[in-house]
């Protein structure tokens, strides 16, 4: 047993308190994720204006729509997919975003679904771009290249918050014994950090490669969608399935099943992008 294995015993998920309000590291990590994604997108606009012909003010307005869509979609998606008491929230809709418990204590908003956030993001992007759909793919590509590094902070936040823990490390796994984290007297994979690397860093490199080798609008979001789906599918083998969900056919987790649906959505965007690029060439 090394110091890393027992890091949770030495770490408090609460960063600091403001009176009765406890600020968790996860909240700070999420803020870093938003800032990172925002400024990464601005950098891309400045560095490659031909691929991303968008004014800063225009992007700032769009970013607010996208972030709102992500938050709404992520929270509602969690309620519909993962929350065992979803019926209560559907009849008490205002409680979905209530950051206080029954005693009036601030506890924050817990329970977000990445795939729900993705749906919310796509809906918000479409609504914002509906008057000029030619820019829709440009916006999606811009987020595809700026989101992965922000995502890294989000998963680090999950790790610091000691949530979304990994599966139990087999006793014959030498690497697992080294990198595992003790959670409730069980050595588990640090699945949050595995996801940060696979779904954040690796996917970012995939999208950057696609940016260098493609010119068609919409292909970056397709590469992101397919790349994330693959990396999430792999990472789920190290992540403990939600206790209220378990596994389904072929022992697949809900995250893996939703990732398969994400592949279908990505292929749909690919078809749309292909048709859209043909129209642009014809008009030119």
Swiss-Prot record:
<keyword id="KW-0472">Membrane</keyword>
<keyword id="KW-0812">Transmembrane</keyword>
<feature type="transmembrane region" description="Helical">
    <location>
        <begin position="136"/>
        <end position="156"/>
    </location>
</feature>
<dbReference type="GO" id="GO:0005886">
    <property type="term" value="C:plasma membrane"/>
</dbReference>
<feature type="transmembrane region" description="Helical">
    <location>
        <begin position="62"/>
        <end position="82"/>
    </location>
</feature>
<keyword id="KW-1003">Cell membrane</keyword>
<protein>
    <recommendedName>
        <fullName>Phosphatidylglycerol--prolipoprotein diacylglyceryl transferase</fullName>
        <ecNumber>2.5.1.145</ecNumber>
    </recommendedName>
</protein>
<comment type="similarity">
    <text>Belongs to the Lgt family.</text>
</comment>
<comment type="function">
    <text>Catalyzes the transfer of the diacylglyceryl group from phosphatidylglycerol to the sulfhydryl group of the N-terminal cysteine of a prolipoprotein, the first step in the formation of mature lipoproteins.</text>
</comment>
<feature type="transmembrane region" description="Helical">
    <location>
        <begin position="14"/>
        <end position="34"/>
    </location>
</feature>
<feature type="binding site">
    <location>
        <position position="155"/>
    </location>
    <ligand>
        <name>a 1,2-diacyl-sn-glycero-3-phospho-(1'-sn-glycerol)</name>
    </ligand>
</feature>
<dbReference type="Pfam" id="PF01790">
    <property type="entry name" value="LGT"/>
</dbReference>
<dbReference type="InterPro" id="IPR001640">
    <property type="entry name" value="Lgt"/>
</dbReference>
<comment type="pathway">
    <text>Protein modification; lipoprotein biosynthesis (diacylglyceryl transfer).</text>
</comment>
<keyword id="KW-0997">Cell inner membrane</keyword>
<feature type="transmembrane region" description="Helical">
    <location>
        <begin position="252"/>
        <end position="272"/>
    </location>
</feature>
<keyword id="KW-0808">Transferase</keyword>
<dbReference type="GO" id="GO:0042158">
    <property type="term" value="P:lipoprotein biosynthetic process"/>
</dbReference>
<feature type="transmembrane region" description="Helical">
    <location>
        <begin position="218"/>
        <end position="238"/>
    </location>
</feature>
<feature type="transmembrane region" description="Helical">
    <location>
        <begin position="190"/>
        <end position="210"/>
    </location>
</feature>
<dbReference type="GO" id="GO:0008961">
    <property type="term" value="F:phosphatidylglycerol-prolipoprotein diacylglyceryl transferase activity"/>
</dbReference>
<keyword id="KW-1133">Transmembrane helix</keyword>
<feature type="transmembrane region" description="Helical">
    <location>
        <begin position="106"/>
        <end position="126"/>
    </location>
</feature>
